[in-house]
Regions:
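Catalytic-core regions of core metabolic enzymes
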Residues: 2-309
């Protein structure tokens, strides 16, 4: 697993800025594909949550308004008008490569790539191009990212999340909601919740996600929601050990009962032999002193025990 995290890349500064400074929590976000059925629905929901969306991009519809938001033909026009560094991409998969490249060329630093069914070759091209340009991609096939009670970019519902000091990183969208709901119900609010994405190629993998928060004083603990398939969790366990990651970590792994060599839901959720199996992940997490919950409701129980130690 390749990991490249620029130490100068501060996801919180880009998403919300610094508390006390002008514009805190109101960083501008551009929505690509805003006027499509998918993009328009979630633009309304993001705006209602508090996300500052001053512009959207739909080629051929420049000059129009949607929900009192200006529509531009190109990303360069939208970025010039707003100064945005964040893009939420809601275009259909066949248009993703062009849309993402245009965003990066326009100076966008954080791309939230929501669409599923992105060809692996296209995802790799965007990932490599983003790294060369000093940008970061979340996704593809991600529910997005949310700073609870401040802003969100993506498709997640608002109800499960509450502000706090726990971070949730998840390979599954719905399980990110479920785990966060259980954490909230037991009084463990979230500082950040980020969907890694369910595809084999991740713009920001688990190790890179951990690096984004490891030195932050406002992050007390991390919950990582994994699933069968691939070796992301095994690599993460080794990272926790080798870098002496000291923040408390709790894990949940979906798909424990899944049959081997059968894809379950996500393109990345497939087990070959013992490679990518739940047993392999649990074993490696145990070596890293990471408790693994058997169900989402058990996550806050394990977190409480971990924090008491």
């Amino acid at each position: 697993m390749t990991t490249t995290v620029e130490k100068t890349f501060n996801i919180f500064d880009i998403l919300i800025g610094t508390e006390g400074e002008e514009g805190f929590g109101k960083k501008p976000v551009i929505i690509q594909g805003m006027t499509g059925s998918y993009g328009s629905t979630h633009t309304r929901l993001m705006k209602a949550y508090g996300t500052n969306i001053p512009a959207g991009v739909t080629p051929g519809k420049g000059g129009q308004k949607f929900e009192d938001i200006s529509v531009y033909n190109t990303m360069s026009e939208a970025v010039e008008a707003t100064g945005a560094q964040i893009s939420g991409i809601f275009v259909p998969a066949p248009f993703f490569l062009k849309a993402a490249a245009e965003a990066i060329d326009s100076g966008i630093k954080l791309l939230v790539a929501v669409p599923e069914h992105i060809p692996i070759r296209d995802a790799i091209k965007v990932l490599e191009y983003a790294r060369r340009k000093g940008a970061r991609m979340i996704g593809p096939n991600t529910p997005g990212v949310i700073v609870p009670e401040v802003m969100k970019v993506g498709i997640m519902p608002a109800q499960p999340f509450k502000a706090g000091t726990t971070v949730v990183f998840s390979r599954s969208g719905t399980l990110m909601y479920d785990v966060s709901y259980n954490l909230t119900g037991k009084g463990y609010g979230q500082r950040l919740c980020l969907g890694i994405g369910g595809d084999p190629i991740n713009g920001t993998n688990l190790i890179e996600a951990f690096e984004l928060v490891r030195d932050r004083d406002d992050v007390e603990s991390i919950v990582v929601v994994g699933e069968i398939g691939g070796d992301a969790e095994e690599q993460l366990a080794q990272y926790i050990i080798s870098t002496n990651f000291i923040k408390p970590v709790i894990a949940y792994i979906a798909g424990r009962a899944a049959p081997k060599e059968k894809r379950m839901g996500h393109a990345g959720a497939i087990v070959y032999g013992n490679y990518g199996s739940a047993e392999s992940k649990v074993t490696n997490y145990a070596k890293a002193n990471v408790p693994v919950a058997k169900r989402p409701a058990e996550v806050p129980e394990l977190l409480a025990k971990k924090l008491r130690k």
